[in-house]
């Protein structure tokens, strides 16, 4: 792969946590952490041609990004892609097609970096990209964390008036069960063929691989509690893990205090 598109995608609204994509995280705009990780990755790969695009229906988010990253191409999101029931893959396909039309380029793959994953390192992106380079037969690489629960051992579902194992098994110890992973939504590496030729709206209806990240570095931010917990974890990671601190130090402070809200 020689030509890549990096995307940052975020909606204006969020039912669980209002304006979460505009929040400051540890004193800096949340979106800047993904952009700084992308910039560090780009600086390490001068042999690649890489463009960065922001797909959003939030003018506030677009202005915030443009203030410090004017090279990022803004793709205003249409109303048809703004709802919370729109499959993520439709936004990816929209971004990919519009960028190819706009730039006249044919990208080999897209790397999507989720805004609500500020504790992602440049090496995490490197690992996912390397896996995609090694395995040309895989259409998608998902970033994942080792799961703390296992459907073969300690996960239940409600069936009528009682509970049952999610997957029936005879395992008596977690170590006996197959290893499973949580998809953490931090990084997706998706080949062009999937985005252009595949009509299926479900990402895992493909041949895919995984790239493992540190589990404590990723929490789904769906509430104020999640956000505060991630900030507390961040302080520990910044103090003890230089690879996390690199993105923090490379991230600009907020240009406008208004984005605290």
Write out the residue ranges for each language-model feature.
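Short phosphate-binding loop-to-helix
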Residues: 59-109, 127
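N-terminal nucleotide-binding beta1-loop-alpha1 segment
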Residues: 1-18
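Short aromatic-hydrophobic micro-motifs that form the base-stacking/packing surface
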Residues: 111-113
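A short, N-terminal amphipathic alpha-helix
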Residues: 30-49
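Single conserved hydrophobic/aromatic residue that forms the stacking wall/gate
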Residues: 250-261
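Conserved core of the sugar-phosphate nucleotidyltransferase
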Residues: 90, 109, 118-207, 211-213
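Conserved alpha/beta core of the MobA/IspD/sugar-nucleotide pyrophosphorylase nucleotidyltransferase superfamily
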Residues: 181-252
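Short beta-strand/loop segment that forms part of the nucleotide-sugar
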Residues: 49-57
């Amino acid at each position: 792969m020689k030509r890549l598109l990096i995307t940052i995608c975020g909606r204006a609204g969020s039912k669980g946590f209002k304006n979460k994509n505009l929040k400051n995280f540890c004193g800096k705009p949340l979106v800047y952490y993904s952009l700084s990780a992308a910039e560090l990755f780009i600086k390490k790969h001068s042999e690649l041609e890489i463009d960065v695009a922001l797909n959003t229906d939030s003018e506030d988010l677009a202005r915030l990004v443009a203030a410090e990253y004017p090279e990022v191409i803004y793709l205003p999101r249409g109303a048809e892609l703004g709802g919370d029931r729109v499959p993520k893959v439709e936004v990816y396909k929209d971004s990919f097609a519009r960028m190819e039309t706009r730039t006249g380029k044919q990208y080999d793959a897209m790397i999507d970096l989720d805004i609500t994953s500020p504790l992602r390192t440049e090496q995490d992106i490197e690992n996912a990209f390397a896996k995609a380079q090694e395995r040309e037969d895989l259409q998608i690489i998902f970033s994942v964390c080792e799961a703390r629960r296992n459907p073969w051992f300690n996960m239940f579902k409600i069936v009528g008036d009682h509970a049952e194992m999610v997957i029936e098994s005879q395992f008596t110890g977690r170590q006996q069960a197959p290893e499973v992973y949580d998809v953490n939504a931090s990084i997706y590496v998706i080949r062009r063929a999937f985005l252009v030729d595949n009509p299926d709206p479900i990402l895992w209806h493909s041949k895919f691989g995984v790239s493992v990240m540190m589990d404590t570095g990723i929490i789904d931010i769906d509430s104020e509690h999640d956000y505060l917990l991630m900030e507390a974890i961040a302080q520990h990671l910044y103090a003890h893990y230089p690879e996390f601190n690199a993105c923090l130090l490379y991230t600009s402070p907020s240009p406008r205090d208004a984005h605290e809200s």
